[in-house]
UniProtKB/Swiss-Prot annotation:
Record membrane topology: Multi-pass membrane protein
Cited InterPro entries: Cornichon, Cornichon_conserved
Main location: membrane
Source organism superkingdom: Eukaryota
GO biological process, one term: endoplasmic reticulum to Golgi vesicle-mediated transport
Name recorded for this polypeptide: ER-derived vesicles protein ERV15
PROSITE patterns, A to Z: CORNICHON
Similarity annotation: Belongs to the cornichon family.
Residue numbers on the Cytoplasmic membrane side: 1-7, 77-114
Organism: Saccharomyces cerevisiae (strain ATCC 204508 / S288c) (Baker's yeast)
Length: 142
């Protein structure tokens, strides 16, 4: 792995952190809706504003690894990429304020699953970043 691999995994790590923060924000919003701290219209406005950028960011991360030849890392990202693409294609990525209470449980489960995925992938990217850094240092020494 070269310096390109190091910068690629650092970029992936940072962008993955943004997606994780987005999922944490969604989790907090769903909890606020359950506790009646926020109304359904405001929740839908906030979630809908960030749902497409989150999918685009995930697609961008996947494309980065695909175009740089990291097939295994790309394949790790394919399930969430396919799920996001399916939601956008079927136009189910936007929440409706009149429907949110019926879908709240499913939305929370989806949010927790994505958050778990992003956390696992965070540690994978971190590990690969450290190994790339060590390989880069070993190449500089020799």
């Amino acid at each position: 792995m070269s310096g390109t691999g190091l910068s690629l995994f650092v970029t992936g790590l940072i962008l993955n952190c943004l997606n994780s923060i987005c999922q944490i924000y969604f989790t907090i919003l769903y909890g606020d809706l359950e506790a009646d701290y926020i109304n359904s219209i405001e929740l839908c406005k906030r979630v809908n504003r960030l749902s497409v950028p989150e999918a685009i960011l995930q697609a961008f991360i996947s494309a980065l690894f695909l175009f740089n030849g990291y097939w295994f890392v790309f394949l790790l990202n394919v399930p969430v990429l396919a799920y996001n693409a399916s939601k956008v294609y079927k136009k189910t990525h936007l929440l409706d304020a009149t429907d949110i209470f019926r879908k709240l449980g499913r939305c929370k489960i989806e949010c927790f699953l994505k958050l778990g995925f992003y956390l696992l992938i965070f540690f994978f990217y971190f590990y690969r970043m450290v190994t790339a850094l060590l390989e880069n240092d070993a190449n500089l020494i020799s």
